[in-house]
Amino acid sequence: LSAGERGLAIAGFSGGGKSTLMLHMLERDHTAFLSNDRVFIRRADNALQMRGIAKLPRINPGTLLNNPRLHVLATPQQLQDWEALASDELWHLEEKYDVPLARVYGEGRIRLAGPLTSLVILNWQRDSDAAPRLQRVDIGARRELLAAVMKSPGPFYQYADGRFLCDGTPFDEAAYLQALDGVPAYEVTGGIDFEAIAQQCCDELLAGTA
């Protein structure tokens, strides 16, 4: 996600709410979508830049139901059926819907690349009653958080000699730490409150006040 000359990457484990949080931040008109998949990062002119894989957000019915802007992506009958489900059933409903950003949020909300100035790692818990907390962390000292950050490039990166990474190739933690050196990392803990964390990310991380 980008906002002017600032940008943040959201990391987390599967089902952690990365896409939902990003869509909450896109409700702010000054933000722009960069990728719903991997981002490649490289240092240029003493700053870290990220380039995203061109992939639209994919959301589940719970995200769609709880965001009125997204209701255009479902039929009235679908919305009615989802509203009748218990929250736990809705959370585990295995259906995915692509979000056509231009249709839902308007033109000009997609960027191919931008600066990386913050990294947010979602480590919150759905069954927690605690308020969500966004706290700066040292990922060099919290190596377990790297598991949520490191992703295989899959077919999107090729070595100069034509080779691709093999399945099962171990990640180079030191390379990630070196690449992210100087980028403030933040861990989100506590219970899940998308709007509260979206507001804090926009007010602090994307505004440069943190």
Please give the residue ranges for each predicted region.
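Glycine-rich, often acidic-flanked micro-motifs
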Residues: 2-13, 27-210
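Post-Walker A alpha-helix
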Residues: 21-22
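Conserved glycine(s) of the Walker
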Residues: 16-18
